[in-house]
A protein has these predicted regions:
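Membrane-proximal basic amphipathic "stem/tether" segments
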Residues: 1-37, 42-44
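Catalytic binding pocket for nucleotide-activated donors in carbohydrate/polymer assembly enzymes
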Residues: 263-265, 296-370
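Short acidic-hydrophobic, aromatic-tinged amphipathic segments that line or gate anion-handling sites
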Residues: 87-93, 271-276, 334-348
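A short, gly/pro- and small-residue-rich
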Residues: 118-139, 221-230, 306-317
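Active-site and donor-binding regions of nucleotide-sugar-utilizing enzymes
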Residues: 37-192
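C-terminal amphipathic helix plus adjacent low-complexity
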Residues: 1-5, 9-10, 24, 28, ...
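Conserved catalytic-core segment of nucleotide-activated headgroup transferases in glycan assembly
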Residues: 49-55, 187-263, 339
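Donor nucleotide-activated moiety binding/catalytic core segment of transferases
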Residues: 89-97, 254-299
Length: 407
């Protein structure tokens, strides 16, 4: 029965695809609204990441580009897009039409701007795609092995890389044509470098643990819960914060926030927050120091030359539920000390206070090697990379037309 329903779902989407392709062809000829369209999106319910910052760049620096942004009408970030103009309500008729009309589909996740991510992922696996060139902006720097993003499993026309070692890893192991992965820098880093500030705040931001990690009441028995709950109620930590007049903000990964209500703070200086109330990028800009386990957000903080401390109490278990290790080794390549116990973590925090919350020279040198592009021009380079892709397509089309004439 499940197979029948899935087949009917595919059939429905194929019919919709044929319909919108036909209507789209007409709209591109008759309406400037859908001609040479760049469609931009993140998860579909937000505007806080590389998609938003690149879209904002397009609207402010290249108003000649016909760009639109897909977002849910009840999103907390809707106003940010309305100010810029070009909002497309997610899942609407205009979303489907724009998706099939667009020359470029630009997003932070695979199958960028798709009305139904999972369905279009499976359709793409069968070679059924929209006409638009797919630009993958990413929503973080890749450090682990992600075979599902290899060329044999995923189609992309432009794969944006945010760091030099990441680019080299993707170029050498993911199997894409040479021109697809490009090191141009993440769009959101432009805002980081322009708006850097530092408050007396420690940010604790652990990553998620995979789809099969225990949830509900079973979550309380996990090492993840036990270690971070212990930290949130640690008297030594509270005393350290009091002595330094600091506060601590605990922001679990979005995928873990369904269980974040189970965490309790042991101090007025320790706050547990979520995506409903706080913007991740603002937290990263505001913090003086980041504590994380394996989350790639540490790249953002390291990009700002702020101290990072890794709290990795469950590395072996983590790999059972999460991605396997890639090119990045935390002890060899990381931007701060690796702690496996709460005692070691408190020691690292104490040392950071003694150093004036400045990143140590050894780690600064590592960031300089990792991020040779550090100039606030990532959006511009991304735009230029898409423009080159556009010219490449024109050249290919002209060559194909010339060949057909000669034949």
């Amino acid at each position: 029965m499940r197979k029948v329903l899935r087949a009917l779902c595919y059939l429905k989407e194929l019919c919709l695809m044929a319909f919108f392709k036909l209507i789209g062809a007409i709209c591109r000829c008759c309406s400037a609204k859908y001609r040479e369209l760049w469609l931009v999106c993140e998860r579909g319910n937000d505007a806080r990441d590389n998609g938003y910052w690149f879209y904002r760049y397009l609207k402010e620096e290249h108003p000649e580009i016909n760009a639109r942004y897909v977002i849910e009408t009840d999103s907390a970030d809707r106003a940010k897009i309305e100010v810029l103009g070009g909002m497309v309500p997610r899942g609407s008729f205009s979303h489907y039409l724009a998706y099939y009309c667009a020359d470029f589909l630009v997003g932070t996740h695979v199958q960028p701007c798709a009305p139904d991510l999972i369905l279009f992922y499976h359709l793409a696996g069968k070679g059924i795609r929209a006409r638009g060139k797919q630009v993958f902006l990413q929503h973080g720097i890749i450090k682990d092995e992600m075979e599902w993003l290899h060329r044999k499993n995923m189609y992309m026309d432009l794969f944006v890389c945010g760091a030099k070692p990441e680019y080299e890893y993707i170029r050498d192991t993911f199997g894409y044509p040479e021109h697809v992965p490009q090191y141009v820098g993440l769009a959101r880093f432009d805002n980081l470098i322009r708006a850097e500030r530092k408050e007396k705040m420690i940010l604790v931001m652990p990553t998620w643990r995979g789809s099969y990690y225990p949830t509900g009441e079973a979550f309380r028995k996990t090492a993840y819960y036990e270690h971070f709950q212990s930290l949130l109620c640690c008297k030594e930590l509270e005393q350290l914060l009091e002595q330094q007049d600091y506060r601590l903000v605990f922001y679990p990964h979005i995928e873990m926030q369904k269980d974040s209500r189970r965490f309790k703070s042991g101090s007025d200086r320790i706050t547990i927050v979520s995506k409903e109330t706080h913007d991740v990028q603002k937290l990263l800009m505001d913090c003086a120091l980041l504590v994380t386990d394996y989350s790639s957000v540490f790249f953002d903080v390291a990009f700002l030359r702020k101290p990072v401390v890794y709290y990795q109490f469950d590395e072996e278990e983590f790999r059972k539920y999460h991605y396997q290790k890639g090119y990045f080794d935390f002890r060899r390549d990381g931007f701060g000390p690796v702690c496996t116990t709460q005692e070691a973590l408190l020691g690292a925090l104490t040392e950071s206070f003694e150093n004036g919350m400045e990143m140590q020279t050894e780690y600064v040198q590592r960031t300089e090697r990792f991020f040779p592009l550090h100039d606030g021009n990532n959006c511009r380079r991304t735009f230029e990379a898409i423009a080159r892709l556009k010219e490449r397509n024109k050249k290919h089309a002209a060559e194909s037309e010339s060949l057909s004439v000669h034949l």
